[in-house]
Structures are given as structure tokens and as C-alpha cells.
């Protein structure tokens, strides 16, 4: 999958942090990553929020919906797709090569989400005041 063996073996699985302030350890661990990939919703949400390139692995609809809603549907792969492993391998390599570009795309997506939230808040506030 990886032509460079250093890349192949420089992979870590996030530990299970527990207890008070464990979220700090969790986010510190994530911030050291070049790429996050997983099927868990929070793995993907946190990666996007931290501007860490993600590859979502769809095993249930909620994850695909996240990527569709924010316009990043190409960053989520369906594990049941016939050529999943080839596509996943290609996406891993491409993501590592395009890290900076993907981070910039995430920043734009988050800015748009904030603008959308602000517009909805104004509409809600107007509706409630009637």
C-alpha cells in the first residue's frame, strides 16, 4: 500500500483516555497526527474541527451524512464498495501528499458553517421575538 516503509510503519491507534481532563490528552494526541481515519463519528468530527485531514470509513449512514452536509463527501469512503481497499489506499496516499490543501479546505468549510449558524441564529431570534 505504501511505497515508503517509514510511512507504512508510522501508524498509531489512539489510546482510550479516561478520567478528568482526558479530553486534553485526547486532543493533544490528535493534534500530532498528519491524518485521521476511522468509522467513528467523533474521530471524523474532531479531525475536521482541528483541521487534520480525515478519511471517513462509512459503516453507517450518520458518518456519510456528516460529510455530505458539509460538502466533503469525497472524504468518506463506503467500506462495502467493491474496490474499497484500492480506493482507500489511493486516498491515504493522496491525503498525505495534499495535507496542506486539505487543511485549508477544512478552514473554509468551518468558516462557512459559522456563517450559516450566524444566519440561522438571526432568523431564530427574529422568529422568537414575534
Locate the predicted segments by residue.
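Active-site anion-handling motifs in enzyme catalytic cores
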Residues: 1-130
Amino acid at each position: 500500500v505504501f511505497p515508503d516503509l517509514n510511512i507504512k510503519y508510522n501508524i498509531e491507534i489512539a489510546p482510550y483516555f479516561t478520567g478528568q481532563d482526558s479530553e486534553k490528552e485526547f486532543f493533544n494526541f490528535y493534534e500530532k497526527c498528519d491524518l485521521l481515519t476511522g468509522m467513528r463519528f467523533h474521530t471524523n468530527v474532531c479531525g475536521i474541527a482541528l483541521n487534520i485531514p480525515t478519511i471517513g470509513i462509512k459503516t453507517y449512514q450518520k458518518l456519510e451524512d456528516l460529510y455530505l452536509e458539509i460538502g466533503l463527501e469525497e472524504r468518506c469512503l463506503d467500506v462495502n464498495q467493491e474496490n474499497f481497499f484500492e480506493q482507500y489506499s489511493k486516498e491515504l496516499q493522496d491525503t498525505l501528499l495534499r495535507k496542506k490543501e486539505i487543511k485549508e479546505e477544512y478552514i473554509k468549510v468551518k468558516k462557512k458553517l459559522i456563517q450559516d449558524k450566524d444566519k440561522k441564529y438571526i432568523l431564530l431570534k427574529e422568529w422568537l421575538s414575534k
